[in-house]
Amino acid sequence: MIRAAIVGGTGYTGVELLRLLANHPNVEIVAITSRTEAGRPVSKLFPNLRGYLDICFTEPEPAQLAAECDVVFFATPHGVAMDMVPALLAQNTRVIDLSADFRLADPTIWEQWYGRPHAAPHLLAEAVYGLPEINREAIRQARLIACPGCYPTAVQLGFLPLLEHQLVDPSRLIADAKSGASGAGRKAALGTLLCEAGENFKAYSVSGHRHLPEIIQGLQWASRSSVDLTFVPHLIPMIRGIHATLYAQLEHEVDLQELYEQRYAPEPFVDVLPPGSHPETRSVRGNNMCRLAIHRPSAGNTVIVLSVTDNLIKGASGQAIQNMNLMFGQEETRGLMHIAVIP
């Protein structure tokens, strides 16, 4: 059994980790931490876990976690993991971080976007970016995984085949992305109150979203060249799900459907839909799948890729478990083969 702990278990990604790990046949959850809820039974805060998980929240103590666990997940705000991870790695405990602390390779860029110096810059080169569709073999050997963000997952999976084969102009990429309100986290915020977000639709962070440098970094790795991306996120009045509409300009003739089908044929969690399809967010609600559809309107040079994911599963907790499976020699799909919930 893989002995696992979750640091930061009161947010949406934390409870999704709990839900998925509680049903994983090869995982024992030994600790779930929260400074504010220490001593409280987890099922009191999340009644859906009653009967599945008999455990109380505890204070996060790195030494104790290292002694008890094979792997520690961080489902915390940025700035928390980088203070605790060095002590865990020193005791040979592997780490999967769902925050942004280790996603960016350049500590200067991290400081620019997150407003504070990085506390563990020496670990940035070691951290493996946890997108299995590009880093599967490195993930298997990793001590430290930087789990991708929700928008970066949907956008990168949509653009990757085009950029890997250098088929489009990398200076003219557009990502028009929409997310449900759970992407903003569980904290109380005016903009995600029902009366504010319900029956409303708006763009935000148009001048620069924190996921932008992460997306650009990944696309540049894929294209092996500089990339210029216009990224506009939107908040839509639903709880969970991401829909990204991606635009690129073709520079070389190619059978787009065949390109995508061949690229993702071996991937258990990327589904390339038939020509003319329009993926829906409800088709991935509660599961670890990314569904893609490729369009070329009027047979012109503009390629449009539609990408949908569940921001809490493939965009966070499910992908984290996918990484864990690879790290510990499990079947990659173990504990993740859930059918999406409709309606």
Curated annotation (Swiss-Prot):
Keywords tagged on the record: Amino-acid biosynthesis, Arginine biosynthesis, Cytoplasm, NADP, Oxidoreductase
tRNA-binding: is it a keyword of this entry?
no
- Pathway it belongs to? Amino-acid biosynthesis; L-arginine biosynthesis; N(2)-acetyl-L-ornithine from L-glutamate: step 3/4
Q: What is its main location?
A: cytoplasm
Where in or outside the cell it occurs: the entry states:
Cytoplasm
According to the UniProt entry, its GO molecular function terms are:
N-acetyl-gamma-glutamyl-phosphate reductase activity; NAD binding; NADP+ binding
Q: What GO biological process terms are annotated to this protein in UniProt?
A: L-arginine biosynthetic process
- InterPro entries per UniProt: AGPR_AS, AGPR_type-1, NAD(P)-bd_dom_sf, NAGSA_dehydrogenase, Semialdehyde_DH_NAD-bd
- The catalytic site is made up of C150
Q: What does this protein do?
A: Catalyzes the NADPH-dependent reduction of N-acetyl-5-glutamyl phosphate to yield N-acetyl-L-glutamate 5-semialdehyde.
The molecule here is called N-acetyl-gamma-glutamyl-phosphate reductase
What organism does this protein naturally occur in?
Nitrosococcus oceani (strain ATCC 19707 / BCRC 17464 / JCM 30415 / NCIMB 11848 / C-107)
Q: Which lineage ranks, top first, belong to the organism behind this chain?
A: Bacteria, Pseudomonadati, Pseudomonadota, Gammaproteobacteria, Chromatiales
